[in-house]
């Protein structure tokens, strides 16, 4: 009974899923096992003592009767029963405690979960706060950009004002007043800027002072904390002090490094500030120097002008003063040159200062980068130290787990979580404040940069004024050109109207084509949408039918399972009935046997009554012996109580030691926390010092990565710890089971051995028996010791194995962590890809919007041009018509009036003549005498009449001609009117066409609006895609949670099975103990029978045995004393062994920790040395670079001085080339516009293609994932159904077994009760009667057999009950899991269906957009090719024209050179003494020749066409080819050695002209070379464009094939079957027959067809696996 108590105690904690034993560490478990061993040994010792007492009682002489013996035995039995009840109560108490512990553990788990949730919520809140901070920063940045834009606008306005003021000042006559006003304005501006700079410097100083105060305050706080914590640190142990000392040394080194770096950084910042201040002062002094020099130059020029006049007068008067004038001129020229060189030097200084500023900014950025890298290194070091600290903390936590309970662990975990949260909060707040400070400093820097930009803009302003003057000159020339063009406009009006009509017709046709294309595209879209809707409906129907199919299958499977279960249950019931019938028959037989035995027992009872009187005497004697034994027992009990007191004292001492150790551990943890706080403070200071130089985005991303990484590490460490604890618990449970089995085995062996010894004792003498017993006990003890030693060695070996397993598990967990990290990286890469796709989509959207705006602008421009042209045409037609009408009418009226006057005159003259004739006739008749006189008059009159008639005829002819002219004029008028009417009709038609165009434009705008709506739909769909992606991520998380739940359930199932096995093993041990107790009872009964039989013999040998008993008692007492001494020695040795083991473990742990820490320290020292070496190398490199910089600066100064001379030469050439460059600019701008259009279209096409490919990839991935999920769900559903059916069958079988077992139990209990009654009767009969030994032995055998049967039945019953409970719980859990999985499966199916529909819609829209883009691309390509050809022809014409001009200019220049050389020769030959007039003549002729030459060049430049070498071409890339061609400026700036030699040899006046001519030659040759290079580039771009066209054609074909493939998506099942047949068929004719089917389904290219044909014939089987068509399989079938 005592053996069962520890077993029950051991069974109690292992029965629960999460008991104290599971949570205890390894050493506590070992201690617990040792305590159990001690208790077992005590129980064994007590059993041996009881056996000895029984033997002593047997050996004592019997004075009284057997009643005393029976009473003693009954008392013993009662005591044993009481002890059993006590043990059972203890077991119940332990169970209750176990339940309480379970509840506490569950509460703690819930608390942990709550804290974890709170931590996650806080993490989310922090992420939101970071995002809000980012948004705020972005808003501040946008505000800052707005402010900068406003300042720039203000600057531009100020520049405009300055320009206006300068123009006003130029209009004024007094230049000196203007200069003074400008100086005053500049002084005001400089004063304002100086005030701003001073304010900014004050702000900087204030911020730096605040930062320094904060740093001082923090240092004070850190010093106070350090003093406070140093007091606590001094209380630590010596080993920990040594470790911390090394740690402190490292920290101080880091601090010193940080302080030095901070000081260096501050010094560099101060240097930069000083440099900037000096730069500002220098930049402010430069304009003042310029002004002073300009004033000096003006004064010199003003002084020089009267001197030159005086000189010229003096020269005219004196020819001898020529030399002095020449000297003065030369001096003035030298002074001018010096001033110009000073001017150029000042310019160089300005540029040098700007370059210096840029270099300093670059150096500052470089320093920032270096500090950022140093900060990252320090952070890495600090992280390593923190990791080392965390490892030490984990060691400390392990020690805590050895000394504390689970509740304390949970409290510590909660406290750590809270501290981490607070730390993160503080860290976030500090970083936000640091970021704001950095932003403020950045804004101040930007302000300073703006100041420098303002100064640069001022310089640009002056340059612009110079350019303005040049533009004014150009404007005057353009004005003259415009006047010429206006005269030509009247002539070109008719041509323009005709061209306009043709353009209108072309536009109308283009608009009509575009409308037709749009309508066709919309119709195709509608058709596709209808097909998509129809397919969706069919798909939904199929999905609904598919949802019904698994339900029907599940119902069929359930019915089949029920049928099989019912059949199995029927068969089992039949077998049970048969077994019950057999049992009933056997029980009937046993009943008959029992009745016969009862009869015999009655007879024996009568005999026992007769013997009772004899045994009463013996009982008196036995009572006396019992009294002695009781005294002996009381002594033993006193000893036991003393030993228990000692044990209690030892336990107290242990508890005190534990408490002291826990206190030390707490102090250690506090010290560690103090050190961690110090490290944190140092880390925060480091962050403050370096946060000003780090970028905001990097810090935020690093923080997020660190948080995620830390969170993941914590989770991984917790999981590792849990796994290790679970594994250790399982291993220890197994070890305990093995120990219990071994103990039970040893017990059974001992009992068997004792039985054998007792059997031998009955045969041999009693004296020898005692000695043998003692020897046997000693031998058994020796064996027990050996077995214990073996067990200890086995445990050590198992411990080593467990440690190896733990290491392997740690390695596996590290591998899993790496896999998880790779997964995280993959997810981040996917995020980056998605962001890139989003950026591409947004860029495409913006490009489309820009295209729309451009189209709108072009449409508006076209409409405006149409309107202007129509108004111009109307006005012109009206003016023409009115002019024609007025002119014609006036001419006709004048002619008519003239004719009328003439006619009237003629008529009047005729009338006068007629009157005169009549008068003459009358007079002739009256006076015939006067006939002769008057005949002459008549003749004269007749001649006059004839002449008049002739004149009248002539006039009539003229009148007829005039009439004809009038008729013609009328006809022309009619024709003009008709033409006017036709023009009006044409105007009306133009207006109608305009209306049509406006309607088409409206339709186009509606199309654009529909396109906008499509874009909005696209945006919505993209948003839906994002939502679906988020859903997919959620589903993935959900699946991960499910997998975790499954793992947990499997773990729980394994735990339950292990606990089940433990319970079964313990039940077996309890049953074995019960059997042993029953065997002991039987043995006692046997001994009692033997004693009763041998009472008669013992009466005779009473006296002898009393003497022998006394001697044996003395010997026994001596042996017991020896035995107790040996026990004490054993206990001491065991305790020493335990202490030695503990010390060894502690020493090994400490040695491991110290070794790890030393390794860490060595690694850190190595890293520090490496870093120092790198820093030294970098410093050396810095020095070398500084030296290089100095040398380079010297070289730059020398080069600048040389460049100035060349620039002076180049300025004159550039002034001549300005006009040609401006003409070339327009052509190049047009070309660049075309190229930009082409590039933008290319980019749009590529983006659209990339989008299409991305969508295809996404579709393929989604479909493959869908197929995988479907297959996975199907397999999981089938597995769950199988497991459910199996578990249901098991449950039914177990229920049937439990029913049968219950029935058997009821039968057995009834039989056992009857058997008890019989046993009592038999005992009563034995008191009265004495029966023969043969009958009693037979009854005993029968009893033993029956008891064995009862034990077996009990074991079976318990097993069946346990299995029933387990199966029921498993069934419930599996059913719940099955329901949840079914629900999730249905949800997943619905979501996949919706996703498929949405993706198909998106695919349709993308395809329609792709077709539109293709058509647009083809049109643009045609346009570009035509434009390219036109440009090529124009460039070739220009090149030819330029070559001709170049030849002409070369010839003219050669002529001029020959003339000049001749003149030079003449000048040299002439004597020096010559009049001043003669000296001035050649110069005048030279100047005249120069002036005559220059217009020739100007005419050539005017005659040239556009695009011949503008400065803007230098910056613009003409082609996309990789050939590098020098720009015009580079060609012009390149020095020419021949020209310099010519310049050195010739005189000053002649050198100037030659240089100009030579430079013109070189510039023209260079421009020709430049144009040749441009032609080559255009040809290269054309070649590239042709290659791109080929690629685009191939891609279009591939896309068309892909579209045709998508038609066969509906017949995937058929395609799958065809492919499977093709794969599994042997190569030959059957495979070749399937080729056309595969070709039609997959739309293969000719190469792919050829490869498939070779595969079908049996060639290249391995190569066909990676062929083109196989790569497309995964997008439909998910085979890959």
Swiss-Prot record:
Reading the lineage from the top rank, the first entry is Eukaryota
Q: Which residues form the GRIP domain?
A: 1605-1655
Region of interest (Mediates interaction with RAB9A), residue spans = 1570-1680
Q: Where is this region: Disordered?
A: 1-23, 1468-1522
Write the record's keywords in alphabetical order, separated by commas. Acetylation, Coiled coil, Cytoplasm, Golgi apparatus, Membrane, Phosphoprotein, Protein transport, Transport
* Record GO cellular component, one term: membrane
Membrane topology per record? Peripheral membrane protein
| Coiled coil (UniProt feature) | 31-1614
An example of a GO molecular function for this protein is: identical protein binding
Q: Which residues carry this modification: Phosphoserine?
A: 1475, 1479
N-acetylmethionine is found on 1
Per UniProt, the ranges with Low complexity bias are 1-14
Q: Where in the cell is it found?
A: Cytoplasm; Golgi apparatus, trans-Golgi network membrane
Q: Which GO terms describe its biological process?
A: Golgi ribbon formation; late endosome to Golgi transport; microtubule anchoring; microtubule organizing center organization; protein localization to Golgi apparatus; protein targeting to lysosome; recycling endosome to Golgi transport; regulation of protein exit from endoplasmic reticulum
Q: Where is this region: Mediates interaction with RAB6A?
A: 1570-1609
Instruction: Indicate whether Acetylation appears among the record's keywords.
Output: yes
Q: What is known of its domains?
A: Extended rod-like protein with coiled-coil domains.
Subunit architecture: Homodimer. Interacts (via GRIP domain) with RAB6A (preferentially in its GTP-bound form). May interact (RAB6A-dependent) with ARL1; might be involved in GCC2 Golgi localization. Interacts (probably via GRIP domain) with RAB9A (preferentially in its GTP-bound form). Interacts with CLASP1 and CLASP2; recruits both proteins to membranes of the TGN. Interacts with STX16.
Q: What does this protein do?
A: Golgin which probably tethers transport vesicles to the trans-Golgi network (TGN) and regulates vesicular transport between the endosomes and the Golgi. As a RAB9A effector it is involved in recycling of the mannose 6-phosphate receptor from the late endosomes to the TGN. May also play a role in transport between the recycling endosomes and the Golgi. Required for maintenance of the Golgi structure, it is involved in the biogenesis of noncentrosomal, Golgi-associated microtubules through recruitment of CLASP1 and CLASP2.
Tell me what this protein is called: GRIP and coiled-coil domain-containing protein 2
């Amino acid at each position: 009974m005592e053996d069962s108590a520890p077993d029950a105690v051991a069974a109690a904690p292992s029965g629960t899923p999460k008991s104290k034993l599971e949570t205890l560490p390894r050493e506590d478990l070992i201690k617990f096992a040792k305590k159990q061993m001690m208790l077992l040994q005590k129980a064994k010792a007590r059993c041996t003592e009881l056996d000895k007492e029984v033997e002593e009682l047997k050996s004592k002489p019997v004075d009284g009767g057997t009643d005393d013996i029976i009473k003693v035995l009954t008392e013993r039995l009662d005591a044993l029963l009481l002890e059993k009840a006590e043990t059972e109560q203890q077991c119940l108490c332990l169970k209750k405690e176990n339940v309480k512990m379970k509840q506490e553990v569950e509460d703690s788990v819930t608390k942990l979960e709550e804290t974890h949730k709170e931590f996650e919520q806080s993490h989310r809140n922090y992420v939101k706060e970071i995002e809000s901070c980012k948004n705020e920063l972005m808003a501040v940045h946008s505000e800052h950009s707005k402010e900068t834009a406003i300042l720039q606008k203000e600057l531009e306005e100020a520049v405009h004002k300055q320009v206006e003021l300068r123009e006003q000042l130029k209009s004024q006559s007094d230049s000196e007043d203007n200069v003074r006003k400008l100086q005053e304005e500049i002084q005001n501006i400089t004063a304002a800027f100086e005030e701003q700079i001073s304010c900014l410097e004050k702000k900087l100083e204030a911020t730096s002072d605040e930062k320094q105060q904060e740093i001082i305050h923090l240092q004070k706080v850190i010093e106070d904390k350090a003093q406070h914590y140093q007091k606590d640190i001094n209380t630590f142990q010596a080993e920990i002090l040594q470790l911390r000392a090394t740690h402190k040394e490292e920290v101080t080194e880091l601090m010193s490094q940080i302080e030095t770096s901070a000081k260096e950084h501050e010094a560099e910042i101060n240097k930069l500030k000083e440099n900037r201040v000096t730069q500002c002062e220098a930049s402010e002094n430069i304009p003042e120097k310029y002004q002073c020099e300009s004033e000096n130059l003006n004064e010199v020029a003003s002084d020089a002008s009267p001197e030159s006049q005086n000189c010229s007068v003096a020269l005219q008067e004196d020819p001898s003063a020529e030399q002095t004038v020449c000297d003065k001129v030369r001096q003035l020229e030298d002074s001018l040159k010096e001033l110009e060189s000073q001017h150029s030097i000042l310019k160089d200084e300005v540029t040098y200062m700007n370059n210096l500023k840029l270099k300093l900014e670059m150096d500052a950025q470089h320093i920032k980068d270096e500090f950022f890298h140093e900060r990252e290194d320090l952070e890495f070091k600090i992280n390593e130290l923190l990791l080392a600290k965390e490892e030490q903390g984990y060691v400390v936590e392990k020690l805590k787990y050895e000394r504390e309970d689970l509740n304390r662990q949970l409290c510590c975990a909660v406290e750590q979580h809270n501290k981490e949260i607070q730390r993160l909060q503080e860290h976030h707040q500090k970083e936000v404040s640091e970021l704001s400070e950095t932003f403020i400093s950045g804004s101040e820097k930007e302000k300073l940069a703006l100041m420098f930009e303002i100064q640069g803009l001022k310089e640009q302003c002056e340059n612009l004024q110079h350019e303005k003057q040049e533009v004014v000159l150009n404007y005057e020339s353009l004005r003259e050109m415009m006047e010429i063009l206006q005269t030509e406009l009247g002539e070109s009006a008719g041509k323009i109207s005709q061209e306009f009509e043709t353009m209108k017709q072309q536009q109308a046709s283009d608009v009509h084509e575009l409308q037709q294309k749009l309508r066709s595209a919309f119709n195709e879209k509608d058709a596709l949408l209808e097909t998509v809707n129809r397919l969706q409906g069919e798909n939904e129907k199929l999905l609904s039918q598919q949802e019904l199919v698994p339900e029907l299958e599940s119902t069929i499977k359930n019915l089949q399972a029920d049928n099989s279960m019912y059949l199995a249950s029927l068969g089992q019931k039949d077998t049970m009935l048969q077994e019950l019938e057999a049992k009933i028959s056997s029980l009937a037989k046993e009943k008959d046997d029992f009745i016969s035995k009862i009869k015999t027992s009655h007879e024996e009872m009568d005999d026992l009554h007769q013997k009772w009187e004899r045994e009463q005497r013996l009982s008196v004697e036995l009572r006396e012996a019992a009294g002695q034994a009781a005294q002996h027992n009381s002594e033993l009990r006193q000893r036991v109580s003393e030993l228990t007191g000692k044990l209690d004292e030892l336990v107290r001492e242990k508890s005190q030691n534990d408490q002291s150790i826990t206190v030390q551990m707490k102090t250690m943890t506090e010290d560690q926390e103090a050190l961690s706080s110090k490290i944190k403070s140092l880390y925060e200071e480091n962050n403050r010092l370096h946060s000003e130089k780090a970028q905001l985005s990097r810090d935020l991303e690093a923080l997020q990565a660190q948080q995620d990484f830390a969170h993941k590490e914590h989770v991984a460490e917790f999981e590792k710890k849990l796994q290790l604890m679970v594994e250790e618990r399982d291993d220890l449970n197994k070890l305990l089971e093995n120990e219990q089995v071994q103990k039970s085995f040893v017990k059974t062996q001992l009992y068997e051995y004792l039985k054998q010894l007792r059997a031998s004792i009955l045969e041999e003498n009693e004296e020898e028996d005692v000695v043998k017993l003692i020897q046997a006990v000693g031998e058994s003890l020796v064996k027990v010791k050996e077995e214990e030693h073996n067990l200890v060695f086995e445990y050590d070996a198992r411990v080593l194995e467990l440690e190896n397993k733990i290491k392997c598990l740690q390695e596996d967990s590290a591998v899993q962590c790496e896999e998880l990290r790779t997964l995280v990286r993959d997810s981040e890469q996917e995020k980056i890809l998605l962001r890139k796709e989003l950026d591409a989509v947004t860029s495409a959207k913006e490009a489309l919007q820009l295209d729309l705006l451009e189209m709108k602008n072009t449409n508006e421009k076209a409409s405006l041009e149409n309107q202007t042209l129509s108004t111009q045409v109307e006005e012109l037609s009206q003016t023409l018509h009115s002019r024609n009408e007025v002119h014609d009418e006036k001419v006709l009226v004048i002619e008519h009036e003239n004719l009328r006057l003439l006619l009237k005159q003629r008529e009047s003259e005729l009338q006068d003549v007629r009157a005169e004739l009549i008068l003459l006739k009358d007079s002739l008749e009256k006076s015939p005498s006067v006939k002769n006189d008057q005949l002459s008059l008549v003749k004269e009159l007749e001649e006059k009449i004839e002449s008049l008639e002739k004149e009248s005829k002539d006039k009539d002819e003229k009148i007829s001609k005039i009439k004809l002219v009038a008729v013609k004029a009328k006809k022309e008028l009619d024709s003009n009117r008709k033409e006017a009417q036709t023009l009006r009709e044409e105007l009306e038609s133009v207006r109608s066409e305009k209306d049509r165009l406006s309607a088409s434009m409206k339709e186009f705008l509606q199309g654009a609006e529909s396109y906008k709506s499509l874009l909005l739909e696209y945006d919505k769909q993209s948003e839906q895609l994002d939502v679906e992606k988020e859903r997919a991520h959620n589903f993935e998380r959900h699946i991960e949670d499910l997998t975790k739940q499954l793992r947990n359930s499997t773990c729980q199932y394994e735990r339950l099975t292990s606990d089940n096995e433990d319970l079964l093993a313990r039940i077996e041990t309890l049953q074995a103990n019960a059997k042993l107790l029953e065997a002991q009872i039987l043995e006692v009964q046997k001994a009692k029978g033997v004693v009763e039989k041998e009472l008669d013999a013992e009466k005779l040998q009473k006296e002898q045995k009393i003497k022998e008993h006394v001697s044996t008692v003395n010997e026994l007492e001596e042996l017991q004393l020896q035995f107790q001494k040996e026990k004490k020695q054993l206990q001491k040795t065991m305790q020493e062994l335990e202490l030695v083991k503990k010390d060894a473990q502690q020493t090994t742990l400490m040695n491991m920790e110290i070794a790890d820490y030393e390794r860490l320290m060595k690694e850190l020292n190595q890293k520090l040395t490496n870093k120092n070496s790198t820093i030294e190398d970098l410093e050396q490199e810095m020095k070398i670079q500084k030296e290089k910089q100095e040398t380079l600066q010297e070289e730059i100064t020398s080069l600048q001085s040389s460049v100035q001379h060349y620039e002076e030469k180049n300025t004159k050439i550039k002034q001549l080339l300005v006009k040609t460059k401006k003409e070339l600019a327009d052509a190049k701008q047009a070309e660049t516009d075309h190229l930009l259009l082409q590039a933008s279209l290319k980019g749009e096409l590529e983006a659209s293609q990339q989008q299409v490919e991305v969508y295809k990839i996404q579709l393929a991935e989604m479909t493959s994932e869908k197929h995988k999920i479907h297959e996975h769900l199907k397999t999981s559903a089938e597995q769950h159904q199988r497991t459910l059916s199996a578990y249901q069958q098991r449950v039914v079988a177990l229920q049937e077994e439990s029913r049968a077992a219950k029935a058997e139990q009821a039968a057995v209990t009834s039989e056992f009760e009857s058997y008890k009654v019989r046993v009592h009767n038999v005992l009563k009969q034995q008191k009265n009667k004495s029966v023969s030994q043969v009958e009693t032995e037979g009854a005993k055998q029968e009893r033993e057999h029956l008891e064995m049967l009862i034990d077996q039945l009990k074991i079976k019953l318990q097993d069946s009950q346990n299995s029933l409970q387990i199966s029921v719980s498993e069934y419930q859990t599996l059913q719940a899991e099955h329901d949840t999985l079914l629900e999730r499966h249905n949800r997943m199916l619905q979501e996949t269906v919706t996703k498929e529909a949405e993706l198909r819609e998106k695919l349709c829209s993308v395809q329609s957009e792709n077709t539109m883009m293709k058509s647009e691309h083809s049109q643009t390509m045609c346009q570009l090719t035509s434009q390219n050809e036109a440009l090529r022809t124009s460039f070739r014409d220009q090149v030819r024209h330029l070559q001709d001009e170049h030849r002409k200019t070369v010839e003219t220049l050669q002529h001029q050179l020959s003339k000049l050389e001749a003149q030079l020769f003449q000048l040299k030959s002439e004597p020096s003494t010559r009049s001043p007039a003669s000296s001035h003549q050649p110069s005048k002729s030279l100047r005249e020749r120069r002036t005559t030459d220059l217009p020739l060049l100007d005419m050539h430049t005017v005659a040239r066409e556009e695009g011949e070498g503008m400065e803007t071409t230098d910056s613009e890339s003409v082609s996309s080819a990789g050939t590098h061609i020098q720009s015009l400026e580079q060609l012009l700036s390149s020095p020419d050695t021949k020209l310099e030699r010519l310049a050195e040899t010739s005189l000053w006046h002649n050198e100037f002209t030659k240089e100009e001519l030579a430079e013109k030659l070189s510039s023209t040759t260079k421009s020709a070379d430049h144009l040749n290079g441009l032609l080559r580039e255009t040809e290269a771009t054309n070649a590239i464009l042709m290659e791109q066209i080929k690629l685009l054609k191939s891609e279009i074909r591939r896309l068309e094939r892909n579209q045709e493939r998508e038609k066969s998506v509906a017949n995937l099942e058929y395609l799958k079957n065809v492919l499977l047949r093709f794969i599994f068929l042997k190569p030959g004719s059957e495979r070749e027959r399937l080729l056309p089917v595969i070709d039609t389904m997959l739309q293969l290219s000719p190469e792919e067809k050829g490869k498939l044909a070779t595969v079908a014939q049996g060639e290249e089987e391995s190569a066909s696996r990676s062929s083109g068509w196989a790569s497309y399989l995964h997008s439909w079938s998910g085979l890959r």
